């Protein structure tokens, strides 16, 4: 279950989890730290709010939603990413998060982050689909043993009717969505 504070879906997911008979250990819950919650203390506070809203004791995966950028944070973007990551590492070491990662980080963002990271990101959730394979970012992540998780893996709806994708899917006995 992919959530994020900025999506506004944590409360609804939390209510659904509470009302269901699903055992917590049988589901994988991801959430993301939003851009305004940067720095060590803000990250820890945002995480506490997220698990309270979801009604869970831990997250399976917690991601920094976007890299801090110079335009938004002036010259403090790398410092804020590092402080934020340090809080994520501490939450991971405390057992409150099973895996930590980033979202929308490109190789140059990861290079900067890993200069201060004790624990490297375990996941980089990026937009990847047949129409935008992001080969450089995928290769970088693979070379650094960082799992790539695709957001928008189907890309545009037209991917489902793309002739090349349909041919590949048929060849492998799959649907176009499964190939994407």
Which residues are covered by each model-predicted region?
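CE4/NodB-like, metal-dependent polysaccharide N-deacetylase domain
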Residues: 43-64, 90-94
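Beta/alpha (TIM)-barrel catalytic core signal, keyed to glycine-rich beta->alpha loops juxtaposed to Asp/Glu
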Residues: 67-180
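Active-site mouth loops of central-metabolism enzymes
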Residues: 33-41, 71-77
């Amino acid at each position: 279950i992919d959530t994020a504070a900025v999506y506004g879906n944590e409360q609804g997911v939390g209510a659904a989890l509470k009302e269901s008979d699903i055992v917590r250990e049988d589901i994988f819950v991801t959430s993301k730290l939003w851009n305004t919650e940067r720095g060590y203390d803000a990250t820890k506070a945002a995480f506490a709010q997220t698990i309270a809203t979801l009604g869970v004791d831990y997250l399976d995966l917690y991601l920094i939603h976007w890299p801090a950028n110079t335009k938004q944070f002036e010259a403090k973007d790398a410092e804020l990413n590092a402080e934020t990551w340090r809080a994520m590492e501490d939450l991971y070491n405390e057992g409150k998060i099973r895996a930590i990662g980033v979202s929308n980080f490109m190789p140059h963002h990861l290079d900067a982050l890993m200069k201060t990271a004790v624990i490297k990101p375990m996941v980089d959730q990026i937009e990847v689909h047949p129409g935008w394979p992001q080969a450089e970012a995928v290769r970088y992540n693979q070379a650094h043993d960082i799992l790539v998780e695709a957001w928008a893996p189907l890309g545009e709806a037209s991917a489902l009717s793309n002739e090349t994708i349909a041919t590949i899917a048929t060849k492998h006995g799959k649907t176009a969505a499964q190939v994407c």
